[in-house]
Amino acid sequence: MAERIEEKYIISYAEYQRISHSIKQVLVPDKNGKNGKYSICSLYFDDVFNTALREKEDGNAVHIKFRIRTYNGENKSIRLERKTKRGIVTEKHSALIDEALLDAILKGESIPEDQECFGLVSEMQAKGFKPAVTVKYDREAYVMPQLGIRVTFDMNVDSLTPHKNTLFGETIGGIPAISRNSIILEIKYTDRCPSFIRKCCQNTGMQLSVSKYALCRHRGEDYNL
């Protein structure tokens, strides 16, 4: 379990160039990607009432999302996650799964109790959650691990139908969720944001009140939950 504060902004490409140049002077690239760059695919779940979507859009103090996430279209690090947000404070529970478990989860099948993901899957199934949309984007990330600081730039955000094949390989055919000239800046920290990060990110674009999940649900074709 990890808890942190997240701030999100939507910025222009020109702002991205300015801010990323400053961030590179004080943070280091995320080691999980070449020069801190990698792609992410997240398959989100919701129920027939769109509870996960509505909790966010209705301004609920607490909202919960379940997702399966892959990196760079590879199957070596598949994660089932539950993300809980209370205002700007985020708590994440995560479990590694393999392709066999992925298939079972997508089919709504039961999971053996000895699996790490059992609790998450049981909760998700009890809520009647089924695949809702796949969100795909490219991320550029910079970190300062000793202070728990993470700054990311997400671009090329696409909405795709929620099928297993959208999590792996070179996925095509997505619908852009935001302009290709827009970037989502996320500032993440565990206690407070250092002043030098604030200085790097000063005069940023407007704060984003919706999630990539919500953006992609609205842009993509409705999936039959």
Question: Where are the regions a protein language model picked out?
Answer:
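Phosphate-end processing signature that detects enzymes handling 5′-triphosphorylated RNA
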Residues: 1-225
